[in-house]
Amino acid sequence: MLTPEENLLLCRVEGDAPMGQMMRRHWTPVCLLEEVSEPDGTPVRARLFGEDLVVFRDTDGRVGVMDEYCPHRRVSLIYGRNENSGLRCLYHGWKMDVDGNVVEMVSEPAASNMCQKVKHTAYKTREWGGFVWAYMGPQDAIPEFVPPAWAPHEHVRVSIAKAIIPCNWAQILEGAIDSAHSSSLHSSDFVPARVGGAEATSKNWLRPSTDKAPRMQVERTSYGFRYAALRRPIQNAATSEYVRSTVFVAPATALIPPNNLYNVANINVPIDDTHTAFYFMAWGNPDNTPETETWRKFLGQQVGIDLDDSYRPLRNDGNRFFQDREAMKNGNFTGIKGFPNQDIAMWVTMGPIADRSDERLGASDLAVVEFRRVMLDALAAFQAGESAIGTGEKAIPSRICSFQAIVSKDIDWRDYQARYVWALDDANIVAEPDYEVHT
């Protein structure tokens, strides 16, 4: 439980809000690469931390991320002409390059040197892992871009589903790091089976446990924390634990325990105080990791079917998230197709910014409590002049990963040699009674 004041510190990201300023000290995904794949193509609107942006790929293939509004009369550049290595405003023809230099002012006298006196707000960018990234912190102290843990090298396949969610980033992040809810909310999609660990089929994720009350243990790190949800396995319960270890990488990434085929992660990028860009990634060996559209279909996150052209879910509170009550009577736990859509329903119905002053937290909420403590402690340190969490001396290590495994009770999960999934393991699937496996 947080006080109303603490809750606002955690959630607010716009303008001078301390949390937003701290988060700006990280390279942040702005949009998908596929949204700006074409040189001289249509500019794309983006919004981060309450700041309106325009994203475009110029004639030379360089990506620009700039203030959406022209420095002349503040007209939107979304409708501008993307041509000849710059973006030209339709109103008076001012043209900016990807660095924010005003390279043409056709409405000014030929002898004018006004171009040299005006600089448009633009941010340094990188392309990696299917995203356009921007550094929106101080532009005189831009850190080197470091590939994230979920895209460690260029040979990795990264398939991304994107959705714009009408609620605050923190309640989405809390859902991502909450292992306990999956045993209930996702029980029709995460099916208990006699397997040696979590396994993926084309329709389900399987897990070797029916335990709905995991014991939680947490370990704080310099970049966030990692924790374990310990469950009784279906087999060898007397000598083993089923461990699902999730990693929170500040400020807004969760490394989710993988399955036998590929790794899973998500990033929750604050659009503003009450909207979030939720990115759900499958990544790993190209031979095992689903292609992008296959991944989106599996999740129920396809544009034109589940989302509109702006990535907003067609399922919403107004249509009850297309909940099928008849399916619920026949055994489906939620009646909502696609487990991310089940999550979205929970996040959205908490309100635009969740009220954390009237909660009743239990033992299963340990990771949620730790997330709040970590971020508020990090914010206090940042306001006192220290570097932002996950930067400087507290930089995120290059090799961190989540894991899931059946582990002997003699082994502490903290000492388990975790590695990300790359090789393909053979599956021998036997479902538990009363559960159905779709392959």
Curated annotation (Swiss-Prot):
Obligatory cofactor(s): [2Fe-2S] cluster; Fe cation
Induction: Induced by phthalate and repressed by glucose.
Amino-acid positions noted as binding Fe cation in the UniProt annotation, renumbered to this chain: H181, H186
InterPro entries associated with the record: Cholesterol_7-desaturase, LigXa_C, Rieske_2Fe-2S, Rieske_2Fe-2S_sf, Ring-hydroxy_dOase_2Fe2S_BS
Domain Rieske residue range list: 27-134
Reactions accelerated catalytically: phthalate + NADH + O2 + H(+) = cis-4,5-dihydroxycyclohexa-2,6-diene-1,2-dicarboxylate + NAD(+)
SUPFAM superfamilies listed in its UniProt record: Bet v1-like (SSF55961), ISP domain (SSF50022)
PROSITE patterns: RIESKE, RING_HYDROXYL_ALPHA
Cofactor: binding comment: Binds 1 [2Fe-2S] cluster. Binds 1 Fe cation.
Enzyme Commission number(s): 1.14.12.7
Highest taxon above the source species: Bacteria
GO biological process, one term: phthalate catabolic process
Keywords: 2Fe-2S, Aromatic hydrocarbons catabolism, Dioxygenase, Iron, Iron-sulfur, Metal-binding, NAD, Oxidoreductase, Plasmid
Record: residues binding [2Fe-2S] cluster: C70, H72, C89, H92
Molecular functions (GO terms): 2 iron, 2 sulfur cluster binding; iron ion binding; phthalate 4,5-dioxygenase activity
Pathway where it operates: Xenobiotic degradation; phthalate degradation; 3,4-dihydroxybenzoate from phthalate: step 1/3
Family classification: Belongs to the bacterial ring-hydroxylating dioxygenase alpha subunit family.
Protein name: Phthalate 4,5-dioxygenase oxygenase subunit
